[in-house]
Amino acid sequence: MKKLLVLVALAACGGTAKKPEAPTGRQAKAKRDPVKPAAYKEFEAAMRAVRLGGPEASETARARLRSALKIDNTIWEAWFDLGAIAWKEGDDDEAVDDFSKALDINKGHTPTLMARAEAYRREGKKKEARADYETAAKNMDEDDPNKRDVATRLASLLRDAGDYDDAVEVLRDTVRTSGINAKIYTELGQIYLAQKRYELAQLVLSKAVQMDAKDPAIYNALAILAARQGKPQESFQLFDQAVSLDANFIDARFNKASALLDAGDYARAKTELAAIVEKRPDDYAAVVSLGVAQRGLKAFDEAKKDWDRVVKEAPKKSAPRADALWNLATLKLDFTEDAAGGKADLERYLQEAPSSHARRQDAENKCKEVKCH
């Protein structure tokens, strides 16, 4: 497992909580009582486990953080880091609970609000996520560059929900008070993409390139635009350009692989996905897709091996693990004629996959069709 970082994927938020000193953020001015020495020692042990890394880092850190909180439950940083561990493991209910306890102590702390917003978002609780994004933005000074990043996250939430007018309004309000940047143009382009307003998408994405010609996310969006316009070669070239700008920008390579899978070009998709997995072995979504490519090439044993690995290694409540369980079931039922094994995997999926997982209804219908019980 990679060395634990607290929600590195979150906009305007990253890194583990600092040592328990004074609460951070311009809204947190109240004087704080000293942390009990025994609790501080446990907290430091948790941070040491994080720094050292290794497969047991998260479990060790979690145990130490809980021990610290038994001694002194006012250490908001410990609640924050517990939430981060839960979020990384896909346990969004626990993450929300832990972040909420951190906010009860360090009220209005922007990184914690952003972290909780991301957990709510992944749970599908749009209203709660939106409220936290909006509160985080209000807590920031107008000239804080992170305010524009928070706005793009909120706008993307609204875009995903189909609330395009609200998403555009959020960006316009932010531009009026805090100015424009390439990320705002890029998000606006993605909103227009979702609305199939391709000329406007092209216009604003071109402006994004003018502001930051080295941001791979812009070329990723342009590649998606080209694909929507029926220009596959241009799309692939733009995906490649995004990757050339930042070899660690996996989104472009993954999107290219997804386009290849959709086109039935399983061999090229496999090449792209294998490159992702080689660079990031714990990118379980990529491993699941690699299994799909293997299945398309009729390499059923290899596909099963990929999905078995995800089931074994991925966080128990994560979407990739649920995807792997579903794919194992359909592989056995629809491709290898292992009806008994497929039924067992379907039942396991229904027992272990999150209730909000995209394939749950399909699994329930499939289970009735094959008479699981």
Task: For each feature predicted by the language model, list its residue ranges.
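Alpha-helical segment of the N-proximal tetratricopeptide repeat
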Residues: 37-71, 88, 149, 156, ...
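Structural marker of alpha-solenoid helical repeat scaffolds
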Residues: 71, 105, 139-143, 177, ...
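Bacterial signal peptide processing site
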Residues: 14-17
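Position-specific recognition of the canonical hydrophobic site in helix A of tetratricopeptide repeat
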Residues: 50, 87, 121, 159, ...
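Canonical tetratricopeptide repeat
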Residues: 81, 115, 149-153, 187, ...
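Residue-level recognition of tetratricopeptide repeat
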Residues: 47, 84, 118, 156, ...
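Structural signature of tandem alpha-helical TPR/SEL1-like repeats
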Residues: 54-64, 88-101, 123-135, 161-173, ...
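Helix-start (N-cap) detector for alpha-helical repeat units in TPR-like alpha-solenoids
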Residues: 32, 39, 76-77, 110-111, ...
